Amino acid sequence: MFDTLLINAYVITMDEKRRVLENGAVGIENGRISFVGDTEEGKKFGAKEVIDCKNHVVMPGFVDAHGHGGHSAFKSIVEDTSYWMPVMTHTYKNYITDEFWYNEGRLSALERLHAGVTTGVCVLGSQPRCDSPVPAMNNAKAYAEVGVKDIVCTGPCHTPWPHRFSRYVNGERHM
């Protein structure tokens, strides 16, 4: 028996097929999601509390409304210091490969998923990396492959000029 059963919802799943259940249910036991499936199937288990979610969307998992691309891979480097931002901004502008953004996105998505986050926001294209769409595309590709839904926010928060950017492509630095 569930503590709570949400029924008749549009349930956006995290399964391999990324199904959307039109008459879905989510069962909760001891504060944890223990069932995601069809409403009729969920009702068979019984519940102390049943909540009708007709015409509502249920997305099992947490939503992280603020994250920054690149930071997962560097979270322990010079953290809690006054010079963290200048060091990281210089690093992002001059020493990061296109593959880094894919690998960092994968790491970040897996860490979020491990914490129960199924949807997140990734601020990526700010001043440190607004010269090319490649970082955002690679980061988003990794999130999609893991299955975490991600909203990538791109575009400069401050004008990037007169800053100089470089990228490493096939081991060669391009200015």
Feature roles, as predicted:
Residues 68, 125-126, 155-160:
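Active-site beta-loop-alpha junctions enriched in small/polar residues
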Residues 25-27, 63, 149:
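A fold-wide structural signal in alpha/beta-hydrolase
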Residues 1-45:
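N-terminal metal-binding scaffold of metallo-dependent hydrolase/deaminase domains
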